[in-house]
Regions:
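Active-site-proximal cap/lid insertion segments
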Residues: 1-171, 177, 183-196
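Single conserved hydrophobic/aromatic residue that forms the stacking wall/gate
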Residues: 201-210
Length: 210
């Protein structure tokens, strides 16, 4: 991935949103929020700074690829065991991209990206990771709390919903436990937080608001 991000965070963010529009994740071009004013323009950086930030994002991209590969290994194992269709797999993030501790993020260690090193995206690349939303982790804006919730459950989700994007159903992480209780038929105290996510066992019912 080294060199892929030398075009800068503005161009990468715009390109990602264009792809999101093509995929149907969003419908209107005006849904792309303004760039974080605290983030410097890419062209204002020195060549050394650009190379450093490019490597920072390249390392992050490589980590995401490894996560994807690892999930694939789990899925293949479940297929081999013949239990994939009756297995519920949930993939989500607890918050938006990590803008800590500021624009520069963290890029520590003799060989950033290796074991023992510390690499954080920083606010500039977190702004890209959360496109088209504004801000990132720690903030109440959508960039901090509106994250994907990806579910695979072949025997439990209507096949007509395969590959679809449910944009009108909102949930919270506390909703996962009551959903699992419903699906497994487990017995738990009736007094608990969260609500059952209806998509997993009945017809979707959009919320009026968030």
């Amino acid at each position: 991935y080294k060199g892929k991000y030398m075009k800068g965070w503005e161009d990468v963010r715009n390109a990602r949103f264009k792809k999101q529009l093509e995929l149907g994740l969003f419908e209107r071009p005006d849904q792309l929020t303004p760039r974080n004013p605290k983030v410097p323009e890419w062209d204002s950086l020195t060549q050394e700074e650009k190379e450093r930030y490019d490597m920072q994002m390249a390392i992050y991209a490589a980590v995401i690829e490894e996560v994807d590969r690892s999930i694939g290994r789990v899925v293949e194992h479940l297929k081999e065991k013949g239990v994939l269709d009756n297995t519920l797999i949930i993939l989500l993030s607890d918050n938006g991209g990590n803008g800590e501790p500021g624009i520069e993020g963290r890029f520590a260690g003799k060989n950033p990206g290796s074991a023992g090193s510390t690499v954080f995206l920083g606010a500039a690349w977190a702004d890209v990771a959360n496109a088209p939303f504004f801000l990132y982790k720690h903030h109440g804006h959508e960039g901090g709390c509106n994250t994907p919730f990806i579910v695979s459950y072949p025997n439990g989700i209507d096949k007509s919903l395969n590959g679809t994007i449910q944009k009108d159903n909102y949930g919270h992480i506390v909703d996962i436990m009551p959903t699992l209780v419903k699906l497994t038929g487990a017995t738990y105290p009736s007094s608990r937080g969260g609500h059952k996510v209806c998509l997993l066992y009945t017809s979707p019912s959009p919320r009026d608001g968030l």
